UniProtKB/Swiss-Prot annotation:
GO terms for biological process: meiotic cell cycle. It is found in: Membrane. This is Meiotically up-regulated gene 111 protein. Has a role in meiosis. GO terms for cellular component: plasma membrane. The keyword tRNA processing does not apply. The chain crosses the membrane at residues 13-33, 59-79, 92-112, 116-136, 158-178, 190-210, 285-305, 330-350, 356-376, 382-402, 417-437, 446-466. It is a multi-pass membrane protein. Keywords: Meiosis, Membrane, Transmembrane, Transmembrane helix.
C-alpha cells in the first residue's frame, strides 16, 4: 500500500486536468482555420483562385495526415521504451514541442506567404512530420494511461482525460470562430500560441516537480511503482493459505514437497481451477475490447474529412464550418458531461461503458446515413446528434484501462498505441480517396465506409456486452 507521503506527493488531479484542458483548447482553436490556411497556401502556390483548390486540398490534407500517423506508428516502440524505463512525462514534453512548431510554422507562413509561395508543401508536411515524430496521438494516449498506473489513479482518470479532450474540442473551435469574426487569421494564431506556451510553462513544471517528489518517496520506501500487482498476489496467496495447512505441515514430515501429498495436490488443483476461471472471465473479452478500440479509431477521421465536404461540396463558408464543428463537439460535450457525472457518483461501471458504446455506435450508423441527405439547414442539428452518439471515447478507453492486466500494462499500452496509429493510418487514405471519388461521381461513396465500420462496431459491442 502506498504511504501517506507518497499519496500527498502525487501530481494533483486538478492540476493535470486544468493543464490538459487549456492545452487542448488552445491547440483546437485552429482545428478549422488550419484548413483555411492550407487553402491560402495552395492558392498562392498554384496561382489560382481559392475556390478551385478543393480537390488539391483534400489530397494534401489526406497526405499530411497519412504522413503524421505513419511517423507516429514508427515511433511507438521508441516512446513505449521511454515510458517504461524513463517517465511518461517525456512524451508529454515532446508533444508540446511538436505543437509549438505547428504554431511557429503557421505564423511564419502567414507573415511571408507572398514572399515564399513555393514553401506551401514544406510548411504543411513539416508540421505533419514533427507532430507525428513528437508522439502526438497514440504515444501520448499511452503516456496518460501509464500515468494512471504510475500514480495509482483509478480508471476514472482515463475517462476524465478523454472527456476533457472532447470538452476542449468543443470550446476551442467555438472560441476560434468567435475570435475570427473580430481578429485576423494571424492574430488568432498568435493568441492561441501565447495561451499554449504560458500554460505549459506554468502547469507542466509543477507536474514534473510533484512527479520527482513522488518518485523519490517511492524509491526511499522501496515500493515497486509499476509492479504493485506482485504485492497484491503475495497478499492474496497469504490470505488464501488456510491455518490447517500450517498445522498439518509438521505432521507430514517433509511430505509436502512430494507430488503424492494429498494436501498440496488438493491446494494446487484448487488454485489451478480458480486461476483458470479467473483468466477465462477476465482475459477473454480483451480481444473484443481491442477490436472495438480499433474500429473506433477507424471512425475518428470521418467528421474531420466531412468538414472538407462542407467546404467544397456544400459550398459553406469557413465561419459556418467552424460553427457546425462547434455544434458537433457541443453534442460530444453533452455525452461526456453525463459520463463525468456518472464517474463522479460512481455509477459509470464497466457494464455502463459497454452499454454506452453499443447504443452510441448503433445510433451513429443511422446518423451517418442521414448525413448523406443533409442540407445547410439540417446539418447543424445532425452534427449535434452525431457528436452525442459518436462520443464513445471515454467508454472505450475506460474499457481498455479496466480489462488490461496490471502486471504488465506497458505491453498493452504499446499494443493499443500501435492499433490507434494503424487504424488512423489506414482510415485517412481510404476515406480521403472516397471523398475524392465522391467529388467526381456520387457523394454516397463517401459515407459507405463509415457506415460499415459502425455496423461492425455495433456487432462487436453486442458480443462484448455478454461477458463480465
Amino acid at each position: 500500500m502506498l504511504s501517506k507521503k507518497m499519496k500527498i506527493c502525487r501530481p494533483s488531479l486538478v492540476l493535470i486536468y486544468l493543464w490538459y484542458l487549456v492545452d487542448c483548447t488552445s491547440f483546437s482553436m485552429n482545428s478549422v482555420t488550419c484548413l483555411r490556411l492550407m487553402q491560402l497556401l495552395l492558392a498562392k502556390y498554384y496561382q489560382i483562385p481559392i475556390d478551385l483548390v478543393g480537390e488539391k486540398l483534400s489530397i494534401v490534407s489526406a497526405s499530411s495526415c497519412l504522413l503524421q500517423y505513419l511517423v507516429a506508428l514508427v515511433v511507438v516502440p521508441f516512446y513505449s521504451t521511454i515510458i517504461k524505463k524513463l517517465t511518461p512525462w517525456f512524451t508529454v514534453f515532446t508533444t508540446w514541442v511538436g505543437e509549438e512548431y505547428f504554431f511557429f510554422a503557421s505564423t511564419l507562413s502567414i507573415l511571408y506567404m507572398d514572399d515564399f509561395p513555393t514553401c506551401a508543401y514544406f510548411v504543411i508536411f513539416s508540421i505533419s512530420f514533427l507532430l507525428g515524430i513528437s508522439g502526438t496521438g497514440p504515444s501520448l494516449n499511452a503516456s496518460y494511461k501509464s500515468l494512471c498506473k504510475l500514480y495509482s489513479y483509478e480508471n476514472s482518470f482515463i475517462v476524465v482525460l478523454n472527456s476533457i479532450f472532447v470538452v476542449s474540442s468543443c470550446i476551442g473551435p467555438f472560441l476560434g470562430s468567435i475570435l475570427l469574426l473580430r481578429v485576423s487569421l494571424l492574430q488568432l494564431y498568435l493568441i492561441s500560441w501565447t495561451i499554449h506556451f504560458i500554460n505549459f510553462v506554468f502547469h507542466s513544471l509543477l507536474a514534473v516537480f510533484f512527479s520527482s517528489k513522488y518518485t523519490s518517496y517511492a524509491q526511499k520506501e522501496g515500493q515497486p511503482i509499476l509492479n504493485a500487482t506482485e504485492n497484491l498476489e503475495v497478499e492474496y496467496n497469504a490470505l488464501n493459505t488456510t491455518p490447517s495447512s500450517f498445522e498439518e505441515q509438521p505432521l507430514l514430515n517433509g511430505l509436502n514437497d512430494s507430488p503424492r501429498n494429498p494436501v498440496s495436490r488438493t491446494n494446487a488443483e484448487g488454485f489451478k481451477a480458480l486461476n483458470a476461471s479467473f483468466d477465462g472471465s477476465y482475459k477473454f473479452p480483451i480481444p473484443i475490447v481491442l477490436l472495438c478500440f480499433f474500429l473506433y479509431s477507424l471512425l475518428t477521421p470521418f467528421f474531420d474529412i466531412h468538414l472538407q465536404f462542407q467546404l467544397i461540396v456544400m459550398h459553406m463558408s469557413i465561419v459556418q464550418v467552424g460553427f457546425i464543428n462547434s455544434v458537433k463537439t457541443f453534442g460530444s460535450l453533452l455525452t461526456c458531461s453525463v459520463c463525468l457525472f456518472l464517474t463522479y457518483v460512481g455509477g459509470f461501471s464497466v457494464h455502463m461503458m459497454k452499454t454506452t458504446m453499443l447504443i452510441g455506435l448503433t445510433a451513429t450508423t443511422l446518423i451517418i446515413f442521414i448525413l448523406y441527405f443533409a442540407t445547410a439547414q439540417t446539418l447543424p442539428c445532425l452534427a449535434l446528434f452525431y457528436g452525442i452518439t459518436s462520443s464513445i471515447g471515454p467508454s472505450i478507453h475506460g474499457l481498455v484501462a479496466a480489462y488490461v492486466p496490471n502486471d504488465k500494462p506497458h505491453r498493452y499500452w504499446k499494443f493499443t498505441a500501435l492499433l490507434e496509429a494503424s487504424a488512423t493510418f489506414i482510415s485517412y487514405p481510404f476515406q480521403s480517396l472516397a471523398f475524392i471519388v465522391c467529388l467526381k461521381y456520387c457523394s454516397f461513396y463517401f459515407f459507405i465506409g463509415p457506415i460499415c465500420i459502425c455496423l461492425l462496431g455495433s456487432i462487436s459491442s453486442y458480443l462484448l456486452l455478454g461477458y463480465h
